[in-house]
Curated annotation (Swiss-Prot):
This is Methionine--tRNA ligase 1. InterPro entries: aa-tRNA-synth_I_CS (IPR001412), Anticodon_Met (IPR041872), Met-tRNA_ligase_1 (IPR023458), Met-tRNA_synth (IPR014758), Methionyl/Leucyl_tRNA_Synth (IPR015413), MetRS_core (IPR033911), MetRS_Zn (IPR029038), Rossmann-like_a/b/a_fold (IPR014729). Its main location: cytoplasm. It comes from the Bacteria. GO terms for biological process: methionyl-tRNA aminoacylation. It catalyses: tRNA(Met) + L-methionine + ATP = L-methionyl-tRNA(Met) + AMP + diphosphate. Its cofactor is Zn(2+). The keyword Iron does not apply. Binds 1 zinc ion per subunit. One of its GO terms (cellular component) is cytosol. It is found in: Cytoplasm. Its EC number is 6.1.1.10. Gene3D superfamilies: HUPs (3.40.50.620), Isoleucyl-tRNA Synthetase, Domain 1 (1.10.730.10), Methionyl-tRNA synthetase, Zn-domain (2.20.28.20).
Amino acid sequence: MSIFIGGAWPYANGSLHLGHIASLLPGDILARYYRAKGENVLYVSGSDCNGTPIAIRAKQEGVTAKEIANKYHEEFERCFRNLGFTYDCYTRTDSEHHHETVQNVFLRLLEEGHIYKKTVEQAYCETCTQFLPDRYVEGVCPHCHEEARGDQCDACSAILDPLDLLEKKCKLCGSTPSIQETEHFYFALHTFQEQIKRAVEIAKQTGTWRDNAIQLTERYVKEGLLDRAVSRDLPIGVPIPVEGYEDKKIYVWIEAVTGYYSASKHWAEETGKDDREFWDGEAKTYYVHGKDNIPFHSVIWPAVLLGIGEGTIPRHIVSNEYLTVEKRKLSTSKNWAVWVPDILERYDPDSIRYFLIVNAPENRDTDFSWREFIYSHNSELLGAYGNFVNRTLKFIEKYYGGIMPKGSIDVELKDKIERLYKHVGEAIEQTKFKVALESIFDAVRFANKYFDERQPWKEREDDPVSCEETIYNCVYLIANFANLLEPFLPFSSERIRNTLSIVNRNWEPQHTLPSRIDSVQPLFERIDVKQIECELEKLYGAVK
């Protein structure tokens, strides 16, 4: 089976925060799991280097947009690598390859009659002497009356046009823009109304889209899909490939999602492999992103794919809700966030991954608190999992000189592990990652109970053969926990694999155990709870 996984493209205008990772982490879990299953996986993403936020940041700092994009693209790559993300292709939207692919898609839509020209009114700033792209206009949402940008309201998820906003202001200078006529290209989104409606109905029946994606898309369909501009007067981006319109750029909402397609083509060119199987309609596709990106993946990207006759409507939409920090909404402008480069300097990446999965905002907003993060590490990763691994392997090191005791796998344990693989695999495929991880840790707690009840420290004196059986089965559990947890906690799983000399990485019960255990090291270190206050002081002290 061919599995295509697309992770949303973060804007290269500032550092990643934990909210980004909470929404993107499911993609890596899926990729690791399906590779272990032996499926053909293509997992892509990249940095959005063409968006208005980059141009605004560059203007504020007095540098070029390219300098801003380069800085954060490199930082993103480093962060994703250090968190264990296993993209097959992580690229950027300002590459020549991406520009060519997007222009080809634009021309195909134009040739098929899905794009047309239209004279429209647009916000124009007399002070800055330029037409204002959507994100250059800010004001009040006409639907919920919260602060909003000209392209979308984060509060109610409404897709907006800058002219819809109340109390419009130019983001660059703060002045009130005038309204002037200009010509732009439009995408005939309304012609895909019935196909998108059918896609939502199927998703509702199969449960393959998150509830928030179903509800929001149903709302758009009920209101009637409106044609959307596909060109804008932007300072950076992909030029319109039509004579006389080269100064205009392809609007980022259609250009950025086409990044999945361009990244796929780039991967094919770089590896010499064929990517067509990921777009032939038979592939299982997963699109992983935050709630704010739902309409781009449930309406716009499907319409583009239908318009060019390529691929299928996204089968799985994995759209997490929002992550708050200490019960407050994340705010990058106020510096109310936990920044990824910062937290990676001091904490184990598996600790970060564990907390963001077990507290994932899968169906509702969830909160990151330093207290819960540190207690979660100490009680679950160290106290439950690390403790079971360490005391088992240290027992072998101390009483058997590192030589693996002889034994046979207990039938009940074998059955339990086989059922666990099936249950966890099904949960991952259904994008229920929290359920999957909690199931494994339920088994870890069972393993600790098994160790305590068998009391190998007593068995060693009273019944040496029974003691060997106990320890042998504990190692069997450890080997399989490492395998089951690899999609979630890859770094600690790799350390266990090395200690146990495990070579097989397939998604199946591990029955081959080592003959010897070498270099037993603690799987996790305890985090001093005093760090909670230190981190809170740092967080509150940095607020703007």
